[in-house]
């Protein structure tokens, strides 16, 4: 079987080329061709020796997921549906803003964590994505938008906030982020790569040492009682442990704060008393808040908090001194908004079957 070079960080690719009898600078050349010029044809890598190109043809490939569908929203958001084989598809989303362009990248086919308000979670779980399948999303987005080294950068930020829990696919996600950060890869700064986690505490501690990027935490609740219900991983790593891990992470993080994400669910976690409880909860953690209006999907069982409830919640946090934003709902007309990504998952957990047995809908998130 041929080796997919997209799976390699620069050190790993350098080692691979050394085993082929090639000098280290060849690895840098190939990295730039793959990631900066979006090239997956060895014959087009014209500054490589013909003998090396022949070796690569025989032993290697640059294989990205197959593009199945590209959609553009009326607000400029773009979504790509990528086939990763055996009936599984994942989604990645580009969100343009005045001062930046953010790509939301998936890390798994489905998700095993079963957050109750998330469409991806309802689809069940199949497998982790490979490093090539993760970085291939960035590769495709650049390719689709016509990005070249001579163009102005379009994707300025990457957020690991798509399908899946990134820290549950630790090795492949870290390798992909290292490629994003590498000057011979995508050249992003650590401040511009954000990993979002539901709170896998041991992996957060590993990430602090291995590849500290900006951190976002899917908090969504002001106490363990509510969080146990809507983010079940909280039963294993309760809020006290999660917040302590956030404090430890900030010792080496590129930013001096954690972003807490908080989906606003009507009558569940959106009351003024919840906001005040939240202020008390995070008092020892330098942080910002990102309030996320819930994006309904069929038979989700939840409603979106009212605009008045969101404003009142935001004001309580702001008055306590916390920078608080309310996320704009982007790409809703193409199901690209937060919590709507579902792709196509050949579920190994039977979660979808169990959900249907309870009277759910096969339309959830699709």
From Swiss-Prot:
Its EC number is 2.1.1.192. InterPro entries: Aldolase_TIM, Methyltransferase_A, RlmN_N, RNA_MTrfase_RlmN, rRNA_lsu_MTrfase_RlmN/Cfr, rSAM. Binds 1 [4Fe-4S] cluster. The cluster is coordinated with 3 cysteines and an exchangeable S-adenosyl-L-methionine. It catalyses: adenosine(2503) in 23S rRNA + 2 reduced [2Fe-2S]-[ferredoxin] + 2 S-adenosyl-L-methionine = 2-methyladenosine(2503) in 23S rRNA + 5'-deoxyadenosine + L-methionine + 2 oxidized [2Fe-2S]-[ferredoxin] + S-adenosyl-L-homocysteine; adenosine(37) in tRNA + 2 reduced [2Fe-2S]-[ferredoxin] + 2 S-adenosyl-L-methionine = 2-methyladenosine(37) in tRNA + 5'-deoxyadenosine + L-methionine + 2 oxidized [2Fe-2S]-[ferredoxin] + S-adenosyl-L-homocysteine. It is found in: Cytoplasm. Pfam families: Radical_SAM, RlmN_N. GO terms for molecular function: 4 iron, 4 sulfur cluster binding; metal ion binding; rRNA (adenine(2503)-C2-)-methyltransferase activity; rRNA binding; tRNA (adenine(37)-C2)-methyltransferase activity; tRNA binding. Keywords: 4Fe-4S, Cytoplasm, Disulfide bond, Iron, Iron-sulfur, Metal-binding, Methyltransferase, rRNA processing, S-adenosyl-L-methionine, Transferase, tRNA processing. Its main location: cytoplasm. One of its GO terms (biological process) is tRNA methylation. Residues 97-333 form the Radical SAM core domain. PROSITE patterns: RADICAL_SAM. Its cofactor is [4Fe-4S] cluster. GO terms for cellular component: cytoplasm. Disulfide bonds join 104-338. [4Fe-4S] cluster binds at residues 111, 115, 118. S-adenosyl-L-methionine binds at residues 164-165, 196, 218-220, 295. The active site is at residues 91, 338. Belongs to the radical SAM superfamily. RlmN family. Reaction proceeds by a ping-pong mechanism involving intermediate methylation of a conserved cysteine residue. Specifically methylates position 2 of adenine 2503 in 23S rRNA and position 2 of adenine 37 in tRNAs. m2A2503 modification seems to play a crucial role in the proofreading step occurring at the peptidyl transferase center and thus would serve to optimize ribosomal fidelity. This is Dual-specificity RNA methyltransferase RlmN. The lineage of its organism: Bacteria, Pseudomonadati, Pseudomonadota, Betaproteobacteria, Neisseriales.
